[in-house]
Amino acid sequence: MRTSGSRLFTSESVTEGHPDKICDAISDSILDALLAEDPRSRVAVETLVTTGQVHVAGEVTTSAYADIPRIVREKVLEIGYDSSAKGFDGNSCGVNIAIGAQSPDIAQGVDTSHEARVGGTDDEIAKQGAGDQGLMFGYATTDTPELMPLPIALAHRLSRKLTEVRKTGVLPYLRPDGKTQVTIEYDGDRPVRLDTVVISTQHAADIDLDNLLAPDIREKVVDAVLADLDLPSPLDTSDIRLLVNPTGKFVLGGPMGDAGLTGRKIIVDTYGGMARHGGGAFSGKDPSKVDRSAAYAMRWVAKNVVAAGLSERVEVQVAYAIGKAAPVGLFVETFGTEKVDPARIAAAITEVFDLRPGAIIRDLDLLRPIYAPTAAYGHFGRTDIDLPWEHTDRADKLRAAAGL
């Protein structure tokens, strides 16, 4: 039962077999292959999937070679689309490629920053300009041990579990495409009750929804995930509304059901709508693109602020001008949960973190093939893989800089 001061907040996730996530995975797999051979590769790869077809386009400047058709087919098969009975088959789908070089007009601003052109510098970090203008946000909260909002964290866990029970054969009749949605009741800033879970999963034909699928999803997915929850404060899960495939059957899925595109799940990729978003997608982009690298840096900053005890919730924004190394703006929002003056937090961030693109790439060691695993189940708050922007290695320095 909701209390008078409560509110409901909802976030969604999708499985790796969702058409848009197939595209993200292909784009990031191509990126990783290029970075593995040439860490200085400039990559902007977009993917489209539709019935029986994969289209890869974009701009790449590199000394590396990537066998793109092979990468595409291997990724599609790894996800689980290996038969026409599933609506898509990595063995036989068409693969079309249209890739050119990065624009020299963009490259000049990344290779030689505005600061270097105007003032001259021997500082290699200062020489690298931002690959585009834009604004990026980072967020952290004490909802979960990984300092993520609970709705998106739980939605991702459910999506990962859907894939796990499919791939391990626990529920062999499941198919790769699927979505999850979680509604949490908050009392103020504290999550107190799980209100609704929606799970839509592709399945084999002739599966009984009420007598097989729904009970299996409750036991093998929802109950299993909830049993593993370890939260800072109690969460009431005693009266969950569970909706499994509320449209009925879900046999036709994947690229046959819907066309997919890289970069169409940016809220799923980040904070599930709990924080603002600058609009830039991640997958298929090398770290010279601040859409990706600066968003990772902002998560790193936000997580360290909360881990340092400076605020229970924080959202940080950074902004860049194309070709300029130094950010043009930094904003800190603490939602009234700060333990010190927000101005001191902002000053501490500026002292402890170098937010120039070259410094972000250096400090987070981003010129590595680490991106394909981020293409599904979120780029932030991951507990299943080690990501450098999830480290709280600067919390002590932040505390000291803020005077704690």
Swiss-Prot record:
Binding site for K(+): E46
Main location: cytoplasm
GO CC annotation, single: cytoplasm
Binding-site list for L-methionine: E59, Q102, D258, K289
Protein EC: 2.5.1.6
Keyword Membrane attributed: no
Domain of life: Bacteria
Binding site for ATP: H18, D177, G178, K179, K249, F250, D258, R264, K265, A281, K285
Cofactor(s) annotated in UniProt: Mg(2+); K(+)
Entry keywords, A to Z: ATP-binding, Cytoplasm, Magnesium, Metal-binding, Nucleotide-binding, One-carbon metabolism, Potassium, Transferase
GO molecular function, one term: magnesium ion binding
One GO biological process term: S-adenosylmethionine biosynthetic process
Record bears the keyword Magnesium: yes
Disulfide pairings: none
Cofactor: record remark: Binds 2 divalent ions per subunit. Binds 1 potassium ion per subunit.
Annotated Mg(2+) binding sites: D20
Pathway involvement of the protein, from the record: Amino-acid biosynthesis; S-adenosyl-L-methionine biosynthesis; S-adenosyl-L-methionine from L-methionine: step 1/1
Family assignment from sequence similarity: Belongs to the AdoMet synthase family.
Known function: Catalyzes the formation of S-adenosylmethionine (AdoMet) from methionine and ATP. The overall synthetic reaction is composed of two sequential steps, AdoMet formation and the subsequent tripolyphosphate hydrolysis which occurs prior to release of AdoMet from the enzyme.
Full protein name: S-adenosylmethionine synthase
